[in-house]
């Protein structure tokens, strides 16, 4: 009798864990995107297109905020987000949870945007969120499953018009974290930057790359450099770093000019934000 109990207990724990996982987490079969416009939030599958003719830059200037916002778990996230986004035309957030507080903040600022729902926990979506003061012409969501914990990370590919007539590609990435090698990591990066090699115009690839090892950092750097992108250098550089000393968050770009780049420190998230001021090329 005691032997049967010991045999049955592990099975009960396994099935109990599976039941609890599926009770807490909802993982969509394909990328689900929420589109945000004029204070409205609407569900859209995979891709979104618009006919906007408005340019994302402001008279040749483009200010960018990139930040893993830690699902807004810190009490001061809103005040810091307001401060850091002042003057920005483009915001790339990772681990953004579309709860009421963030929705109100987006609506009050008149932002347009898209969020890719990586998964829902207790019926609250979390994933990458790209916000702009103008709509994109195209936005497509991507997800890559974490091989160990079976929760996906998300990415968002967007195209914005620029005032000089060019098209700006923007990739907002939250890279997979828990992998034994770099195969899944490389696949996620490859999927999101596939169009960059064929794109002659400007591009920005930014987010939480989870580059906690030299192999990961080399894998992403080589692929982006092969696509013609350069990494932004920050000063001051208070980017969040792993115990290896490697930074986790990055901004890569091409076809633009960097005027200022800083990574200030904050306690409003477990990651520090990245602020970059770009201008359109003057020699075009």
UniProtKB/Swiss-Prot annotation:
<keyword id="KW-0963">Cytoplasm</keyword>
<dbReference type="Pfam" id="PF03372">
    <property type="entry name" value="Exo_endo_phos"/>
</dbReference>
<protein>
    <recommendedName>
        <fullName>UPF0294 protein VV1_1880</fullName>
    </recommendedName>
</protein>
<dbReference type="InterPro" id="IPR022958">
    <property type="entry name" value="UPF0294"/>
</dbReference>
<dbReference type="GO" id="GO:0005737">
    <property type="term" value="C:cytoplasm"/>
</dbReference>
<dbReference type="InterPro" id="IPR005135">
    <property type="entry name" value="Endo/exonuclease/phosphatase"/>
</dbReference>
<dbReference type="GO" id="GO:0003824">
    <property type="term" value="F:catalytic activity"/>
</dbReference>
<dbReference type="InterPro" id="IPR036691">
    <property type="entry name" value="Endo/exonu/phosph_ase_sf"/>
</dbReference>
<comment type="similarity">
    <text>Belongs to the UPF0294 family.</text>
</comment>
């Amino acid at each position: 009798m005691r032997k049967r109990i010991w045999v049955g207990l592990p099975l009960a724990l396994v099935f109990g864990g599976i039941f609890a996982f599926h009770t807490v987490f909802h993982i969509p079969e394909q990328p689900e995107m929420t589109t945000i416009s004029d204070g409205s939030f609407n569900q859209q599958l995979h891709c979104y297109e618009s006919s906007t003719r408005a340019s994302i830059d402001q008279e040749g200037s483009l200010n960018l905020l990139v930040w893993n916002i830690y699902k807004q778990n810190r009490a001061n996230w809103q005040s810091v987000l307001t401060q850091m986004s002042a003057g920005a035309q483009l915001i790339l957030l990772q681990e953004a949870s579309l709860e009421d507080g963030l929705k109100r903040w987006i609506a009050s600022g008149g932002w347009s945007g898209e969020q890719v729902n990586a998964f829902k926990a207790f019926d609250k979506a979390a994933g990458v969120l790209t916000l702009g003061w103008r709509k994109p012409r195209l936005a497509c969501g991507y997800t890559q499953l974490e091989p160990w914990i079976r929760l996906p990370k998300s990415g968002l590919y967007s195209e914005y018009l620029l005032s000089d007539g060019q098209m700006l590609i923007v990739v907002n990435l939250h890279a997979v974290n828990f992998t034994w090698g770099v195969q899944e990591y490389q696949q996620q990066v490859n999927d999101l930057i596939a169009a960059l090699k064929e794109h002659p115009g400007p591009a920005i690839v930014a987010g939480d790359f989870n580059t906690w090892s030299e192999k990961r950092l080399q894998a992403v750097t080589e692929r982006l450099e092969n696509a013609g992108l350069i990494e932004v250098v920050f000063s001051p550089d208070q980017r969040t770093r792993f115990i290896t000393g490697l930074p986790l968050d990055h901004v890569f770009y091409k076809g633009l000019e960097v005027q200022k780049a800083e990574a200030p420190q904050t306690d409003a998230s477990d990651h520090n934000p990245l602020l970059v001021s770009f201008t359109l090329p003057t020699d075009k």
